């Protein structure tokens, strides 16, 4: 990434803009033309920082070493979530969170240590959440809560067309895709031909 131009804005804490290969040339040419307008030397900075006064290049001497050290410490903080913004040639962009936590069993990658720990339960077979009625066990608390609806008979998800109720959202979505009668009903409850 020596030639890539990265933008890190104070307004977007922990976010870096990373241009794609196609957009690098366009972005670098825009930076070079802006530098020429301002009477600055030609060339592309590796990193641009946004400030309330405008853009600031890494080569600027106005920033102290203390500022650099505090920036470095903030970027290595465990609570800081790094986000990468990928800029396309047409100007659109996507925010991506790198998957830095890797499972040693299957090499699956995850965005947080929580998600990795939850995933490892699949490999260990551990199911810490147990139903107090039927002794079924689950990896996630949400799955246990969803299972308990079987015993209680609760069906909180309702089809807005035919008013049939379901205990799970995936069952409601399947119903909406599969039920032809539901799709052809009119608002007054009559079937249309």
UniProtKB/Swiss-Prot annotation:
It comes from the Eukaryota. It is found in: Nucleus. Residues 33-75 are annotated as: Disordered. There is a cross-link at residue 34 (Glycyl lysine isopeptide (Lys-Gly) (interchain with G-Cter in SUMO2)). Pfam families: zf-C2H2. Signal peptide: none annotated. A zinc finger (C2H2-type) spans 101-123, 129-151, 157-179. Keywords: Isopeptide bond, Metal-binding, Nucleus, Phosphoprotein, Repeat, Transcription, Transcription regulation, Ubl conjugation, Zinc, Zinc-finger. The modification Phosphoserine is found at residue 44. Its main location: nucleus. GO terms for biological process: regulation of transcription by RNA polymerase II. One of its GO terms (molecular function) is DNA-binding transcription factor activity. InterPro entries: Znf_C2H2_sf (IPR036236), Znf_C2H2_type (IPR013087). SMART domains: ZnF_C2H2 (SM00355). One of its GO terms (cellular component) is chromatin. Residues 55-69 have a biased composition (Basic and acidic residues). May be involved in transcriptional regulation. PANTHER family: EARLY GROWTH RESPONSE 4-RELATED (PTHR23235:SF155), KRUEPPEL-LIKE TRANSCRIPTION FACTOR (PTHR23235). Belongs to the krueppel C2H2-type zinc-finger protein family. This is Zinc finger protein 740.
């Amino acid at each position: 990434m020596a030639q890539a131009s990265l933008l890190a804005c104070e307004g977007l804490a922990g976010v870096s803009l990373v241009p794609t290969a196609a957009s690098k040339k366009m972005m670098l040419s825009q930076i070079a033309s802006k530098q020429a307008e301002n009477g600055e030397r030609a060339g592309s900075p590796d990193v641009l920082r946004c400030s309330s006064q405008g853009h600031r290049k890494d080569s600027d001497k106005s920033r102290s070493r203390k500022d650099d050290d505090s920036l470095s410490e903030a970027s290595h903080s465990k609570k800081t979530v790094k986000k990468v913004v990928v800029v396309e040639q047409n100007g659109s962009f996507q925010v991506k969170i790198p998957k830095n936590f890797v499972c040693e069993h299957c090499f699956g990658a995850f965005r947080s240590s929580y998600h990795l720990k939850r995933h490892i339960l699949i490999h260990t077979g551990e199911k810490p959440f147990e139903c107090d009625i039927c002794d079924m066990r689950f990896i996630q608390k949400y799955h246990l809560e969803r299972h308990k609806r079987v015993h209680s008979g609760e069906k909180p998800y309702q089809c807005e067309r035919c008013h049939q109720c379901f205990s799970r959202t995936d069952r409601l979505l399947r119903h909406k895709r599969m039920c032809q009668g539901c799709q052809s009903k009119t608002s007054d409850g009559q079937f249309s031909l």
